[in-house]
């Protein structure tokens, strides 16, 4: 009942003045999906699913698959995407019934793959080969960023645990198989 008070007409599930619409809506969708035993929240879930998908980079903007922002989710349309927001976005997609064949999941996997310190056919940004430890960092967008900093020796964006968890979980949700080199 409490969470219903945050449902917006446009499908968002968030506080009125928040800058964290993606995070809040994603968590709200997970909650409503878990509580939807009788179908009571079907309409909220459907609108919320469309809402989070509209926030994904590459949907209603001019970003192409070759752009580092493509497929990611951020704090809002004007903010750069990052792996933390994209991970929550994928939680919402999974909770609302999207599988690896969903176009939104496919786009997100492109972004998630680019957050990994591992050069593959799916990941060719300049950071990927500098320190190929297989871990993940915050974002390849806007020149790249890691909350763990830059490796002084190689210039690589450092991988760190919370983003590596987010990246691995996101890849599993997006259907990456265990024999995939990523």
What are these regions (language model features)?
Residues 1-182:
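Preference for long, amphipathic alpha-helical scaffolds in soluble/luminal domains
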